[in-house]
Amino acid sequence: MIFKETKLQGAFIIEPEMLIDERGAFARTFCCRDFENHGLNGNVSQCSISLNTKKNTLRGMHYQKKPYAEAKLVRCSRGFIYDVIVDLRYDSSTFKEWTSIEISAENRKMV
């Protein structure tokens, strides 16, 4: 997996490395060790899927305070997502900054 830093402290664009052969393709989408090597929480406590039945569906911001804070990994298995990240961590050097990325089934990016 290739981790690319965003302008936000601790937020990455993650691109899986595709292994392709005559059978098709394989890619790792999560590895605890890789996440921890980039300062991310590798302890997965939940995995969820969201299905939007209409185009242009808007979903809300997700926010948790300590001790309930969660690391998130967002990917798109069909269509595309315009994902916005806002840094609301008071102790962060990028507090109140934001960034966005288009994530799609085609580009395989995760954030």
Task: Give each language-model segment a name.
Residues 108-111:
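Short, intrinsically disordered, charge-balanced linker/junction segments flanking boundaries
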